[in-house]
Amino acid sequence: MVIAKGEEWGERVRKSDVVYTRNDHDVLTLSASPIKGDIARTVGNGQQKRLDVEKLKTGGAWHQLPFDVIEADVNGATFRAAAHIRVGHFLWGECHLLCNVAMFRGRRVFQKSHPNDGKIEVLTIERDMKLRQRLLAIMRVRKGSHLPHPQLKIWQTTAEVMHFQRPLPIFIDGVKVTTSDTLRISVIPDAINIYIPSDHK
């Protein structure tokens, strides 16, 4: 069940097989406590300076957080993203950023995003937007604000079929997986759990 307004997120558990992860994609296949990447930054777990080996060995106390993922169907293959999907390039042409988390490359892009709200956050940059305007927008995002511009659009969805004017590179959690002119996305609520030390909550 996705989080409701005013509810506490997750629950305290004891678990012995938690693994510290250093990139966003590994949380899909492991009992992960991310310490690097945009997921770690979103949940406030990116400041770990050393591994708590005893906690891992003894099944120490963790806060278990249910987490949505984005499922993407493209060119007959299915991929899952824990953090984000990028289509195209920020500095030229058509570009789309599809996020499950508030952060992208360490910057808060989506102010109201929550990784367990059952929604995908989307930022669309139209292909005709000039380089100077793109750079200004990126600078504003780095400062935690947005540049209003008719060729920038921010919206939410739970499922979408996206058609592009030409084949574009598609990056899943920072890794290029294919090139396509069509992408089908949907959110899978509560798809995985991630873990942060219970004293962080």
Residue ranges of predicted features:
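Catalytic core of DAGKc-family lipid kinases
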Residues: 1-103, 109, 116, 156
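Exposed beta-strand and adjacent loop surfaces of beta-rich binding modules
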Residues: 67-69, 119, 167-169
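Internal helical hairpin/lid segments
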Residues: 91-144
